[in-house]
A protein has these predicted regions:
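Small-residue-enriched alpha-helical segments and adjacent helix-cap loops
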Residues: 2-5, 24-167, 172, 176-180, ...
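Intrinsic, low-complexity N-terminal interaction/targeting segments
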Residues: 5-20
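Short amphipathic beta-strand and strand-loop transition segments with alternating hydrophobic
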Residues: 16-18, 157, 234-235
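Flexible, glycine/charged-enriched surface loops at secondary-structure junctions
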Residues: 55-58, 130-134, 194-212, 218-230, ...
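Short, well-ordered alpha-helical segments in soluble proteins
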Residues: 124, 190-197
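Accessory "access/gating" subregions that flank catalytic or transport cores
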Residues: 214-252
Length: 275
């Protein structure tokens, strides 16, 4: 059963379109794959301190939010984020919603999906048509471990032996892709949604997913429906190094924690409001 179609405009916030909240402006910064360098974390911390309330919020889509923004700072905020490499496209900033397996390429999984995140982000930003995707439309790249496939993505790839299954609104479509063709298949599905939508924001709001024309003949695989979170603590990697996973109380980082993140080489924000 489909969800009701939307009748109002898409008001999903970004950095160019700030949401007016009770405590001031709210800007949402997309982090494809949740990836953030220490320098970028520092840029976000500085922006929040200078323009907002000094905190960062982590979201369930592995993005970050700056709250308490003063009126009229959108231009300066956007310039800062662009200089930090966090706003590569002004036209497509709200459609860069991409989840990815948190430990992909570090330990486990059928494939390293990190290069696919970068490829998908570039393809989205290069296509003028895809700027029309709703701000809540979500992509996910799961390397087969099942940590992000159950997060409610509209278009997802799920790692299987030899490639990926295309998962639409949580269901295996029967289409398969090699790593080389994986991103093209995701973009094809997104374009199909734009062709058939009539005010809907999400795939599960369509009356008939078959209208997308994205079905295939492959034997269906079981798609996990329960999120498999990465454990908290020190996690050994296949290269002999270790990753450290932690949770952020209430998903809110204060000035002290933000200062410490500057020294990190790479940070992965998780959909369960941790890193």
């Amino acid at each position: 059963v489909s969800s009701p179609s939307r009748t109002g405009p898409d008001r999903c916030p970004g950095t160019l379109r700030v949401h007016a909240a009770a405590d001031g402006g709210l800007a949402r910064v997309r982090l494809p794959g949740g990836t953030l360098s220490g320098a970028q974390a520092g840029a976000l911390a500085d922006a929040s301190r200078d323009l907002g309330d000094g905190h960062l919020e982590l979201t369930s889509r592995a993005n970050v939010q700056i709250r308490g923004l003063r009126d009229g700072v959108e231009g300066e905020l956007s310039e800062r984020l662009h200089d930090a490499g966090l706003l590569p496209s002004f036209t497509h900033e709200r459609v860069r919603n991409i989840l990815a397996s948190v430990l992909s390429g570090r330990d486990g999984g059928f494939a390293d999906v990190r290069p696919l995140v970068n490829e998908l982000d570039a393809e989205l930003c290069a296509d003028p048509e895809l700027a029309g995707l709703p701000g809540r439309f979500l992509f996910a790249l799961d390397d087969g471990r099942g940590d992000v496939i159950a997060q409610g993505a509209d278009v997802a790839l799920y790692g299987i032996e030899g490639g990926f299954a295309l998962v639409l609104a949580g269901r295996d479509s029967g289409r398969r892709a090699s790593p080389a063709g994986a991103v093209a298949l995701m973009v094809e599905a997104a374009r199909a949604f734009l062709r058939v939508r009539d005010g809907e924001w999400r795939l599960n709001e369509l009356d008939d997913l078959g209208a997308l024309g994205m079905g295939g003949d492959a034997e269906r695989v079981a798609v996990p429906e329960t999120v498999r979170r990465v454990p908290v603590g020190v996690l050994p990697q296949s290269d002999g190094r270790a990753a450290v996973s932690g949770l952020v109380p209430f998903g809110r980082l204060g000035p002290d924690a933000l200062g410490e993140l500057r020294a990190c080489g790479e940070i992965i924000v998780t959909p369960w409001r941790g890193w």
